[in-house]
Amino acid sequence: MAEQQKTRVTVDIYGQQYTIVGTESSSHIRLVASIVDDKMREISEKNPTLDISKLAVLTAINIVHDYIKLKEEYDRLLQKLHKEKDE
């Protein structure tokens, strides 16, 4: 079994540099990091007294919430598509 090529990218998230290693393209990794950075900054603006750990947890909760809503919408649309296909 062939091993996938790994991409190593250094990104900046909320003023900290992280080296991310993954199988996605460097542009994809940078996009993910940018979304996390943007969400952390958005939450920090509304809650300036949060320490970095709590900010990170709230960011994760917000991003997973968005993911679940999108997944539910995707599943709903997929179910609708299958229903229309079967008619």
From Swiss-Prot:
Pfam families: ZapA (PF05164). InterPro entries: Bac_CellDiv_Activator (IPR053712), Cell_div_ZapA-like (IPR007838), Cell_div_ZapA-like_sf (IPR036192), Cell_div_ZapA_firmicutes (IPR023688). Residues 64-87 form a coiled coil. Keywords: Cell cycle, Cell division, Coiled coil, Cytoplasm, Septation. GO terms for cellular component: cell division site; cell septum; cytosol; plasma membrane. Its main location: cytoplasm. It comes from the Bacteria. GO terms for biological process: division septum assembly; FtsZ-dependent cytokinesis; septin ring assembly. It is found in: Cytoplasm. Gene3D superfamilies: 6.10.250.790. Activator of cell division through the inhibition of FtsZ GTPase activity, therefore promoting FtsZ assembly into bundles of protofilaments necessary for the formation of the division Z ring. It is recruited early at mid-cell but it is not essential for cell division. Homodimer. Interacts with FtsZ. Belongs to the ZapA family. Type 2 subfamily. This is Cell division protein ZapA. It comes from Geobacillus sp. (strain WCH70).
